[in-house]
């Protein structure tokens, strides 16, 4: 039984990366192999990633695009509000978090960015439905602000608008970036293609719940947020082909991992093979989970006590991740969204009863 304190660590605040490096691939890469004892830790640069993978392997990317989802505005009474779009639900509708001195009721008009009005609809706890006067994706792109994570202390600027998106982002809908993908630039993707490494994409729209803290000591009691994903048939076919030739399936980021494993678990439970899937998932991966698809994972360094730290601990091993994080802190790696990366290899056996 793991508790919340098992996933805590002390991080010097100066190791929280506040800005992106000048070049996407300039970050460092900690290669971690917990299948051997003691775990093998190799300090690399991200430009070395191609040398760590092989022709015939499959890299799976999340092609979601971050919305300019944050708005400041006011109620008709003049009271100030802050709005964070959680999910676009229709051409003119979205779910949002609203911070205000008093929660607005249905029918309330809100002025956003001093540019347009939205009307509050029904409450879908903990969110509010907002009705937009024009297509909401257009208004969000024109008037919204990029929703940088809460631990990044500066206001978003033009650099962030480029660097807090992956170079392959194509499906608008996220309110946080799939940050492992931020390290890839087009020359690296071209280099991987030339090596014979396969690439495929899925979509998982990352919600603000990714920053939601775990507030219970017994992690089994935590209620995971839900996110929408789309795993296409073309990816299913590439996974099958990769398995047939003995290659590794490598998830780029925890969001790609969660979509792949959610679809695979659903297929298992239905007694059928992996298939194209569009669905909601609230999958919560903790030590003891049996991974069905992913062999290796490219990921950033995660927050203490976070669900993502639990996920990587389940994947590579709790003690392996503890050792890797101690090493990263000693070696002054940069942490979180704009920080450095890890390349993890899946542990052979789960550490607790199967989930």
Swiss-Prot record:
GO CC entries: cytoplasm
Places the protein is found: Cytoplasm
Domain of life the protein comes from: Bacteria
GO biological process, one term: tRNA wobble guanine modification
Catalytic activity as recorded in UniProt: 7-aminomethyl-7-carbaguanosine(34) in tRNA + S-adenosyl-L-methionine = epoxyqueuosine(34) in tRNA + adenine + L-methionine + 2 H(+)
Primary location: cytoplasm
Keywords: Cytoplasm, Queuosine biosynthesis, S-adenosyl-L-methionine, Transferase
Function: Transfers and isomerizes the ribose moiety from AdoMet to the 7-aminomethyl group of 7-deazaguanine (preQ1-tRNA) to give epoxyqueuosine (oQ-tRNA).
Record-linked HAMAP family: QueA
Name listed for the protein in its UniProt record: S-adenosylmethionine:tRNA ribosyltransferase-isomerase
Source organism of the structure: Burkholderia lata (strain ATCC 17760 / DSM 23089 / LMG 22485 / NCIMB 9086 / R18194 / 383)
